[in-house]
Amino acid sequence: MSSPSGGEDSKDDEKDEESNRLLPLSSSSQSQSLQSENYSDEVAFEAREKIVIVDVEGPHSIDAVDYVPPFSWRKLWLFTGPGFLMSIAFLDPGNLEGDLQAGAIAGYSLLWLLLWATVMGLLIQMLSARVGVATGRHLAELCRDEYSNWARYILWFMAEVALIGADIQEVIGSAIAIQILSNGFLPLWAGVLITASDCFMFLFLENYGVRKLEGVFAVLIATMALSFAWMCGDAKPSGKELLKGILIPRLGSKTIRQAVGVVGCVIMPHNVFLHSALVQSRKIDPQKKARVQEALTYYSIESSVALFVSFMINLFVTTVFAKGFYGTPQASSIGLVNAGQYLEEKYGGGLFPILYIWGIGLLAAGQSSTITGTYAGQFIMGGFLNLRLKKWTRALITRSFAIIPTIIVAIIFNTSEASLDILNEWLNVLQSMQIPFALIPLLTLVAKEQVMGVFKIGPVLERLAWTIAVLVILINGYLLIDFFISEVKGLLFGFLIGSGTVAYVSFIIYLVSRCGTSPSNGLSLELSERITCNGN
């Protein structure tokens, strides 16, 4: 406490200092310290890295157990960041390719589905944030304690496979953008290397604080928004058709594949793990019910705004290609590789050629998604395996997992657009297969009182979440079946696929069967004190 004899200058200095200092140690903080010493686990963010949420209501609000402060724009700003990083997965090159194909083949008719798919994605991501805030641990850490060793190693492997598949798409998307912006001078493999090095450069900013890294993402999202909004303005889409597409549900038999792609891109397995870790970048005491409730409120607002922005960006891309290519002979052949060429032929040059505007937006999408992919890889590997490594070491390991196969892919498929399209389909299938292994553990944990305490979801929300999860899994299952029927040839290959399917379904049944069981002893022991404290 400041001395009464101090002048106004000293009070101002203390206020400035208070805005940067950590919250005072309380009994719960000491309890957390003891817990971390006992467990010595890998954590998403060290205490010194976390952003302090400074109270503006007065000292009484800090100690009050059930006092939830009124809404504050300043606090909303302090909580802003994780939701926008999470929203990058809704804007990666794979999603942009789904947008342009939906627009070219289905016109404006699937915009309503894009809207509701984004809403479904928002619900899943809010549950992910809820787990991270209420428990003080992220999803991969909780899975490590919830499941037996063999099951968690399978979950870790599946999460890594999904991440590598997404990363290959994202890095190649950046490489395509670099190829466009260099007028074809740089080949795909060179773009892959540039993207990899840029990713490490951006991650270096994390050493200067989480806020700096979040600022970089804000610039990249703004770049995407401006680029694709500019393209939409150049295309001059029909406002009437746009509104009809958003408000009136329509689904034709010829657009089912595109509809499946729109919904299937909503849930990215690595993003479910990522968001539960990102919310821990703010200093929140999970043992104080009011603090957790306040954080959940602000994170819900921030995530909603972030995904509204992502919806608008996806809307811009879809409408540009709906206006320019719907009903044309080129519609069925447009992909991420040749989209720039088709845009240039359709809309021409001008003061700012649309080809380069598309390249800038695609580059921002690719760069931002590769950074979040590396970020997610650190949390997934550290959480499942409990690796206490330096962040640069973890980044190097997780980056190598994706960059090496991506360079091989870029060299092999450098000159073949058709081969890249087939590869992209296989990667979509690969990621679709991993969705249950992120959704089922999330919904299992978020509904358990032993894990969540008073913040477990209620029966209505639980049924809604499971309905969405089953819907997404079935839709992606349709994509898998359709793909395998058309692509899988030969008896031996069919036998291998069939055997793998049996093992795949068996593991999903095992995960679902765990929904009603109690968590492991280690997790129960750690969380029993939190439940008691939250109930006070």
Swiss-Prot record:
Biased composition (Low complexity): 22-36
Membrane topology: Multi-pass membrane protein
Coiled coil: none
Gene Ontology BP annotations: iron ion transmembrane transport; manganese ion transport
A molecular function (GO) term: manganese ion transmembrane transporter activity
Cellular compartments annotated: Membrane
Keywords: Glycoprotein, Ion transport, Membrane, Transmembrane, Transmembrane helix, Transport
Membrane spanning residue stretches: 76-96, 104-124, 161-181, 185-205, 213-233, 259-279, 305-325, 347-367, 400-420, 435-455, 465-485, 492-512
Function: Probable divalent metal transporter.
Family (UniProt): Belongs to the NRAMP (TC 2.A.55) family.
NCBIfam families for this protein: nramp (TIGR01197), Nramp_1 (NF037982)
Protein name: Metal transporter Nramp2
Taxonomic lineage: Eukaryota, Viridiplantae, Streptophyta, Embryophyta, Tracheophyta
Gene name of the record: NRAMP2
